[in-house]
């Protein structure tokens, strides 16, 4: 079986991370679809969130994720949801990512068709973000999701936060959904040997693009001439980061690498190590959520390779796994975690 000439990745995030039966039902359309491969199902109990990764031909991916959404909206009730991760809806975010033979503009159209179909069928408020955003304040997902589910009823009533698709009204059981087209994003977390989330967040503030608030001697934020709070930029321009809890005893720096070619996995790992050491902590483990491009692993592998120039991809990947501490929480299976290798495995099977 040959690999399709056009491939789109879709990574829907569902606000359920504990009930395996519900996730099994939600992902069944992917397992049953022709022309779509289920690459990863990442359930997080503390986040109460599951990240599903599928890849396939554009039309089949669109149909399949709509089917998954239909099931999720029937089974997940946001009135009963709690979890560590920021969220605003049962189907929280649905990104479309070009992989092969597809442009970002074509993925924008896929996201718009998804939003139109789902909002029409369920009356679900949907916001377009990233490359699909129709206004500047909706490019960044954290801006759309600010206030989360609990603040959505008030937020959606504001004219400036009227959804792009669907009614401007609060749906208590469903919440709202964000969808859009974006480039490949790497979700990557680094655990620390502390249970103090504030320490993880202080490290996150030093490395993320948005940085931290500038405060005066009394600890009050300083307001600039434009009326906005002044911020001190962090180390990396293409990084989102925050402090979360991996479990009840382990804090972590949770990140989205928006441009892994500019800001690599090894770059953020080493920065976290350095910042952690300054406050008497250690980085203990790395965690990838979803899949990672091969080139990102090879880049990290080159960084952590001690010997002469190495061209063997398998050796470089092993170097990356060790350097990024990806084998500290559980066995890291590169054949199922690296996008290109996972696609090849799916085609061969």
Language model regions located:
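Long, contiguous binding/interaction regions
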Residues: 2-349
